[in-house]
Structures are given as structure tokens and as C-alpha cells.
Amino acid sequence: TASAGNHGLSLATGAKIFGAKSIVYVSKNVPNKFIAQLKSLGSKVSIVGNTYDESLKAAVDDSKKNNWILISDSTWEYYDTGLDVMEGYLISISQALQKIKKNPTHIFLQAGVGGLAASFAAYCRKKLGYSPIIIIVEPSFAPCLQHSILKGEPTLVQGPASNMGRLDCKYPSRQAFYSLSRTANAFVSITDKESLKGTLFLSKRGINISQSSSAGFVALKKLIKRGDFLLDSETRALCIFSEGDVR
């Protein structure tokens, strides 16, 4: 598989449990902490390219050439194994909703290729209906879902690498895009500078997470200042912190 971190750890863990071999392709921008964790789980790590998309292409090409089984967290035409990965994400959102006493009025979901966001949004629509406003958050350097919505089809975007490494994806998951086009209310982007500022804000309050993880919260703060999306004193916002500090 190719991964910017978390999916690779999951796959490496599963392979170890079942006695299988795993190879995880990562870009040069993936934190060394992730690479060390992958190796500790027995996975071989191949560092290819500067972005997730470049490492994914290498994983796809080598899988075809070597007749390997590819387990990607993304989907594209004629490949939908990523749907199984998306189904696994449902455990997290179901646990989150169980702990909430009152239903959220707003849900902020960070997105890379969109798999996690799409599965969470679909689950929330099923359980909560269309009352919560669901907002998808992407890096300003990689707003592939936002651009895809504007184009009406999965669309490649160009841009420099973002510090929000797990969200730095230039092309969306096909299935995630079409799902979010029906379940999400809005797509917003945040800059790396805004991301860093928001992450430091949380750190000073004892919440130590990565810039990728804090994206939903950062967008919430940004939109409150702008007075958008009916955010007021009665708002009950749900943000998902999807990983800890990876430095």
C-alpha cells in the first residue's frame, strides 16, 4: 500500500497478525516516527516521491509488476478496495457519537483523499439525518475535494507540499468524492500558517496532536471569526482528532 502514516500502520499490524509480508510506500515528507513504527511492525518501507500521490503511483505500478495484493485507502475507476478501509473507520465515529449527550449541530471533518471524511459523513447522515451541518476541511495546498466538487468529477490539483502531511493529497478517492458530494454541506481550506497556530493553541491547553489532526478544529475557529455557517453560542461542534503528535 501507500500511506502518509495511519493507514500504513493499520495494514502493517494486520499483516503481522496474519503472518503476511507488507510493503508500505511513503513519500519523503512522511515523519520519521511513522517510518520507524512501520519497520517495528515488520513492514518494509519504500520511500518514493515528494507526495502521497507519487508514492501511491509507485505502489500501484509495483503491485501490478510483482502480482502483489494492493490494499489502498483510496479508490479509483475499477478499484474499490478502499471501501473496506472506509468501513473500518466507522468504528471511530460510532464511538464518538455514543459519547455525545446531545447531537452536534456542526461536524468538521478533515480530508486527504477523503476516505475517513466520507465514511464519517455517511454514518452521521444515517444516524443524525440532515440536521447537522457537515464541513469538509482540506489544506489550502491540496484542496482536491473542493476543486472536484466545482468540476463535478475527481480532479487533480497542483501545489507545494503541506505541513498537514496526512491531508496532503492532490487527487481524491473516487468513491469518497461521490459520497461527499451528497453528504457534505461545505468544503473549506485552511493554510499551513493557520494550522500551526491552531495546533499550538491546543498544545498550550494540553491537547498534543498533529497539524493534520487539528484541521477540523482550526476551521471551526476560522469560521467562527467570519460568522459563517450559523456558528453561534448555541453551536455544538464535533471535531475529530485522528492522531496524536507525530513529531
For each predicted feature, which ranges?
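Small/polar-residue-rich loop-to-helix segments that shape phosphate-bearing ligand pockets
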Residues: 23-106, 149-188
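Active-site-adjacent helical/loop segments in soluble small-molecule enzymes
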Residues: 172-232
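Glycine-rich ThDP/TPP pyrophosphate-binding loop and its adjacent helix/strand module
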Residues: 91-128
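Glycine-rich beta-alpha junction loops
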Residues: 75-78, 111-115, 138-143, 163, ...
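Buried hydrophobic positions in well-ordered alpha/beta secondary-structure cores of metabolic enzymes
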Residues: 5, 15, 38, 96, ...
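A short, small-residue-rich loop immediately preceding and capping a beta-strand
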Residues: 1-26, 104-116, 237-241
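Short, acidic/small-residue loops that bind anionic groups at enzyme active sites
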Residues: 19-34, 127-141
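Alpha-helix C-terminal capping segments
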Residues: 9-19, 121-128, 218-226
